[in-house]
Design a protein with these regions (language model features):
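Serine-hydrolase catalytic machinery in alpha/beta-hydrolase-like enzymes
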Residues: 9-12, 21-103
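The feature captures the conserved acid-bearing segment of alpha/beta-hydrolase catalytic domains
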Residues: 142-222
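A conserved amphipathic alpha-helix that caps or lines the catalytic cleft of carbohydrate-
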Residues: 41-42, 125-126, 188
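The conserved beta1-alpha1 loop
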Residues: 26-30, 139, 165
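N-terminal cap/lid segment of alpha/beta-hydrolase-fold proteins
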Residues: 1-18
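Conserved hydrolase catalytic core segment
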Residues: 124-134
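Gly/Ala-rich beta-loop-alpha elbow adjacent to hydrolase catalytic centers
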Residues: 113-118, 122
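Short beta-strand immediately N-terminal to the catalytic nucleophile in serine-hydrolase-like folds
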Residues: 109-114, 138
Length: 227
């Protein structure tokens, strides 16, 4: 599937797929992910569903995708808490631009997904709006300080939720990140109790293994779950 670049706001977004698509897949991406994007989209395309996929770049990963400020937990960079600005850009610029440019149905099914902190952003965004049909959260950073308490007070509104984690991810020496296993179990149980259509899949390996294929699997599950 060939990519094209579309300028939205001041950002060069990488677009794959076709006009009139049933699904619109959105993923916030860092520079470190762009080289594997072709492979990820090829894996998503193993689904029979018609989709348009947009990779939307973020300048500062830790700032743009974090819902509130938090101190550094790994290396030295903390979190700037600018997710609300990122979500506003998605809802006010990206989605309307793509709908118009690619003649998408008014009620196109929008799936927000991503890996790591982008997965957490997708989950957080679904507590703020009911715009999204589904969330594809691969190895999401649910260890993020205050997230689990926040979600309990302001629950996710999205009907289809895919969660995954590498089976070695919780065995880190970083005490904050080591909570990821317990947190994702708790979140999955909460969602199931509320009647959300959700799954939790365990992948082999640590956090940095097969990020592109894990994310592709997440998007595919959400598209195929209702069929």
């Amino acid at each position: 599937m060939t990519a094209q670049t579309m300028q939205i706001g001041n950002r060069p977004c990488r677009i794959y797929g076709e006009a009139h698509a049933e699904y619109l897949l959105l993923q916030m991406t860092g520079e470190h992910e762009l080289q594997s994007m072709d492979g990820e989209v090829a894996a998503i395309a193993q689904s029979a569903h018609h989709f348009l996929f947009a990779a939307i770049p973020v300048e500062n990963w830790n700032d743009a995708l974090s819902p509130w400020e938090a101190p550094a937990v790994w290396r030295k960079q903390g979190f700037g808490g600018k997710a609300a600005d990122t979500l506003r850009f998605l809802t006010e610029q990206v989605v309307p631009s793509l709908k118009q440019q690619f003649d998408l149905p008014e009620k196109v099914k929008i799936i927000l997904g991503g890996y790591s902190l982008a997965g957490l952003f997708a989950l957080w965004a679904s507590t703020q709006t009911n715009l999204f049909y589904g969330v594809a959260a691969a190895s999401p950073s649910v260890w993020f300080p205050g997230w689990m308490e926040f979600e309990q007070q302001r629950p996710i509104q999205t009907p289809y939720i895919y969660l995954s984690l590498g089976d070695k991810e919780e065995h880190t020496k970083n005490t904050v990140m080591a909570a990821v296993g317990d947190s994702i179990h708790t979140l999955h149980s909460r969602l199931a109790e509320r009647g959300t259509d959700c799954t939790l899949e365990w992948n082999s390996g640590g956090h940095f293994k097969d990020a592109d294929l894990r994310t592709a699997k997440a998007f595919r599950w959400v598209m195929e779950e209702h069929t």
